[in-house]
Amino acid sequence: MRPVRTLLALSLLAAAPAFAITGLDAEDIAAAEGLRERAMRGSAAWNVVESLTTEVGPRLAGTPADARAVEWAKAKMQAMGFDKVYLEPVTFPVWLRHHERAEVLAPYPQPLVITALGGSIGTGETPIEAEVVAFANLDALKAAPEGSLDGKIAVITNRMVRFKDGRGYGPAVGARSQGAVEAARKGAVAVLIRSIGTSSDRFAHTGTMRYAADVPRIPAAALSNPDADLIEHMVARGKPVRLRLDIAAETVADYTSHNVIGEIRGRDLPGEVVTIGGHLDSWDLGTGAIDDGAGIGITFAAGALIGQLDRAPRRTVRVIAYANEEQGLYGGKAYAEARAAAGEVAAHQLGAESDFGAGRAYALC
């Protein structure tokens, strides 16, 4: 977990005249190179992630763990020496997962590993029992005739392809975000998707989904990759595949969480801002170490290292731990709306987020 190249670029931007990186003096360059070396040798980012995942753990937005995470982030920034630490409110509806179960009833009875998608409704008091209709991808589902899925469970089995730069995510994620709407339009009573991820382990991967106001809401869940393979193998045998699906999930009243913001004040142009950050929330099925504990660790450490320089950065460095990114970018939107309302958008010289894991940095995008 080494925020080396990103830290170097950010420190150069914070130190330099806007859009004039080539005008850096030797002192600025030496300071940036020193930051890089300290980041390579140190473990500050790792220590932040270890603290977050141990002392808070999963941080589903709107739950008590969310509130604990906010207090943790505020205290951590203060302990790391930020000049100013403060909270800004972020309000959003709360989605809660209670339980999820699925099994094949026929032709070859066996359990399935699933997880409800974020925002999904439940199946109600009685589990859904229905025949499966499988689709290779979202486009195939869209092409199905109207009414062809009446009383059926749609299963979308497209795979996410692994690429270093993550470009396989975009083509795959439509099944998750749009699958429930498209399946309901064809008459389906539920939709299952292959987990949007490249793991071959038997763990289902959650993520947010969407409904449309003019289409009935149906339950939506993700199958683990091996279980999606299992459904494909059963369907290929030409016999009707029938499932039982039992999901309890709900969206409840609005909740107010907070963006947690820490600043290292600039020495010459404190009103001009370089922002970096990650999102503080996570899903509830793991510790949130990668998504996005890693980004929190990288950006907290970067800000703290800049703050430890003998000479403060020319511009203010603002580190933001955003609330509820997972379910709709609520924290980022609230931050942008607050800056627009205050007339402060033009003060931002750079905005960057770390939400791509903890491998070696190879580009600043």
Task: Report each predicted region and the residues it spans.
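Stable alpha-helical elements in mature extracytoplasmic
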Residues: 28-31, 44-49, 56, 65-73, ...
